[in-house]
Curated annotation (Swiss-Prot):
Lineage of the species this protein comes from: Bacteria, Bacillati, Bacillota, Clostridia, Eubacteriales
Annotated binding of Fe(3+) 3, by residue: 162, 165, 178, 181
Protein's organism: Clostridium acetobutylicum (strain ATCC 824 / DSM 792 / JCM 1419 / IAM 19013 / LMG 5710 / NBRC 13948 / NRRL B-527 / VKM B-1787 / 2291 / W)
Highest taxon above the source species: Bacteria
Catalysed reactions listed for this entry: H2O2 + NADH + H(+) = NAD(+) + 2 H2O
Protein name: Rubrerythrin-1
Pfam families noted in UniProt: Rubrerythrin, RUBY_RBDX
Gene this protein is translated from: rbr1
Annotated Fe(3+) 2 binding sites: 53, 98, 132, 135
PANTHER family: RUBRERYTHRIN-RELATED
Cofactor(s) needed: Fe(3+)
UniProt keyword terms in alphabetical order: Electron transport, Iron, Metal-binding, NAD, Oxidoreductase, Peroxidase, Transport
Length: 195
């Protein structure tokens, strides 16, 4: 890889690295809140997304470490969210951050990288932007479930799975308590067969 020294791409990569790193930590905090509020599936999704963000940060950092000789990168004009509330507020903040990444930040970072001759960096920004779009979609769907009181109740009959013991229940509403292992409703989610 050619040198990133003195490029706008180096600054953008560092902004992206910092943003992804902070998102990872925020999502870990949000996961704890969701679990405390009885949303175990949402907690797990925050943790899964935190791991996705860690991998994005790693990809951006690898470009930096390959394109610079152990040099620090100063970033100006970047701001990072500080939201920490209940699960609903956290989902709103998370969706907003993901939206900004895929609609504004990463497309502009990709264009700059391409203009500066860093095609691999540009491609990474575009591919990761596509992931961020899916993150936003998922956060908005989870938010809608909370707002419509549909986390543990659906309009049609579903198969609900206890993620602690594997018990499967058929109905419109997840049981208040798992009859097999006695864990609370918080541990039920819609059965997913994606194999």
């Amino acid at each position: 890889m050619k040198s990133l020294k003195g490029t706008k791409t180096a600054e953008n990569l560092m902004k992206a690295f910092a943003g992804e790193s902070q998102a990872r930590n925020r999502y870990t905090f949000y996961s704890n809140t969701a679990k405390k509020e009885g949303y175990v599936q949402i907690s797990n999704i925050f943790l899964e997304t935190a791991e996705n963000e860690r991998m994005h940060a790693k990809r951006f950092f690898k470009f930096l470490s390959e394109g610079l000789d152990d040099e620090a990168v100063e970033i100006n004009g970047a701001s990072y969210p500080t939201t920490l509330g209940d699960t609903k507020k956290n989902l709103i903040a998370a969706a907003k951050g993901e939206n900004e990444e895929w609609t504004d930040l990463y497309p502009s970072f990709a264009k700059t990288a391409e203009d500066e001759g860093f095609k691999g960096v540009a491609a990474a920004f575009r591919l990761i932007a596509a992931v961020e779009k899916e993150h936003e979609k998922r956060y908005n769907a989870l938010l809608k479930n909370i707002e419509e009181n549909k986390v543990f109740e659906k309009d049609e009959v579903k198969f609900w799975k206890c993620i602690k013991c594997g018990y499967i229940f058929e109905g419109k509403t997840a049981p208040k308590v798992c009859p097999a292992c006695l864990h609370p409703q918080a541990y039920f989610e819609i059965l997913s067969e994606n194999y």
